[in-house]
Swiss-Prot record:
Organism of provenance: Shewanella woodyi (strain ATCC 51908 / MS32)
Function according to Swiss-Prot or TrEMBL: Catalyzes the hydrolytic deamination of adenosine and 2-deoxyadenosine.
Details of cofactor binding: Binds 1 zinc ion per subunit.
Enzyme nomenclature, EC number: 3.5.4.4
Gene: add
Binding site for substrate: 14, 16, 170
Residue positions binding Zn(2+): 12, 14, 197, 278
NCBIfam families associated with the record: aden_deam (TIGR01430)
Family statement: Belongs to the metallo-dependent hydrolases superfamily. Adenosine and AMP deaminases family. Adenosine deaminase subfamily.
Keyword Transmembrane helix annotated: no
Protein name (database record): Adenosine deaminase
GO biological process assignments: adenosine catabolic process; hypoxanthine salvage; inosine biosynthetic process; nucleotide metabolic process; purine ribonucleoside monophosphate biosynthetic process
Length: 331
């Protein structure tokens, strides 16, 4: 099967984990930012996580270098454009990218400037390539909560004009959902769709809470519903899709090896699953790679692929018009 040629949808990808290494060097030189090396191989090695990290925290350390050059409007716009360009070149037809505006204020940018720059980069790529996209605004669970509503307010001006959803991301502690109920409710009032990182690090109860307390329509990763019957049943009952990211799950030790990833069991059991990259640079992957790995490891057919593709379309936060165009590609 020609995996490159398949139309693809990626619903879970982080902007700051998907930066071209050469762009880090270029922007650092333009911005007078000190980086450890001018050698692209060394920069790449600092950005790409090992095949298996000790834990999620070691994986998340790989984001410090790209964030150092994502503190200007020009830097954010370029990186946004290049990510959509890279995806378009491997036949990703619809792409939801997420990022945390709170992480881009080190040089004084406003949330409006940050969000606007990301959206502009995406729109520049949409005008040049056969790709459509949207942004998801991620709040980092470990950061100060004082400006969460400010992020929501700034993004509200871009709702359905490049921004569609609200997310909680970063290190996952048991029971985190309770702390964020008022913020998620505020986002829902403003018109945001909701996806939540949960069940990545062994806590199935977090998935149950994300759906029951926060109204999550999709769950980032969610693989640990496998050991939590209540969460498993709720996800099926509510038709909540899991945004699975196979390579990333192995790197962060959420799963030990791909053959033990629950994605096929979920698929066969009627759980709605999607295949995604998570971080193209940090995980050293593409959608083509992720699809190939899953298809070959679990012996899935072309029909299986397009069944998963249709779930991705239906569970996306795209407009009905875009969804209709995407579904035509599966006929």
């Amino acid at each position: 099967m020609n995996y490159q040629a398949l139309p693809k949808i990626d619903l879970h990808c982080h902007l700051d984990g998907s930066v071209r290494p050469q762009t880090i060097i270029d922007l650092a030189n333009q911005q007078n930012v000190t980086i450890p090396s001018q050698d692209i191989n060394e920069i790449s090695s600092l950005m790409i996580a090992p095949e298996t990290c000790q834990n999620l925290e070691e994986y998340l350390m790989r984001f410090e270098l790209p964030l150092s050059v994502m503190q200007t409007e020009e830097g954010i716009e370029r990186i946004s454009f290049e990510l959509f360009e890279d995806a378009a070149k491997e036949n990703v037809k619809y792409f939801e990218v997420r990022f945390g505006p709170q992480l881009h204020q080190l040089q004084g940018l406003s949330f409006d400037q940050i969000i606007s720059s990301a959206v502009k980069g995406m729109q520049r790529a949409e005008a040049m390539y056969d790709i459509k996209g949207n942004y998801i605004l991620s709040i980092l669970r470990t950061m100060d909560k004082g400006n969460i509503n400010d992020v929501i307010d700034a993004g509200a001006a871009y709702l359905n004009k490049g921004v569609v959803a609200f997310d909680l991301a970063g290190a996952e502690l048991p029971g985190f959902c309770h702390e964020f109920i008022p913020y998620v409710n505020y986002a829902i009032e403003k018109g945001y769709r909701i996806t939540i990182h949960a069940g990545e690090q062994g806590v199935g109860q977090n998935v149950f809470d994300a759906v029951s307390l926060l109204g999550a329509e999709r769950v980032g990763h969610g693989i640990h519903i496998k050991g939590h019957q209540g969460a498993y049943d709720l996800v099926k009952e509510k038709s909540v899709a899991l945004e699975t990211c196979p390579s990333s799950n192995i790197q962060t030790k959420a799963v030990d090896v791909l053959s033990n990833h629950p994605i096929k069991a979920f698929y066969q059991g009627g759980v709605l699953i999607t295949i995604n990259t998570d971080n193209r640079t940090v995980s050293n992957t593409t959608m083509t790679d992720e699809v190939r790995k899953v298809m070959e490891e679990f012996n899935l057919s072309r029909e299986d692929y397009f069944a998963i593709y249709r779930v991705s379309v239906e569970q996306s936060f795209a407009s009905d018009e875009v969804k209709q165009e995407l579904l035509k590609l599966a006929e």
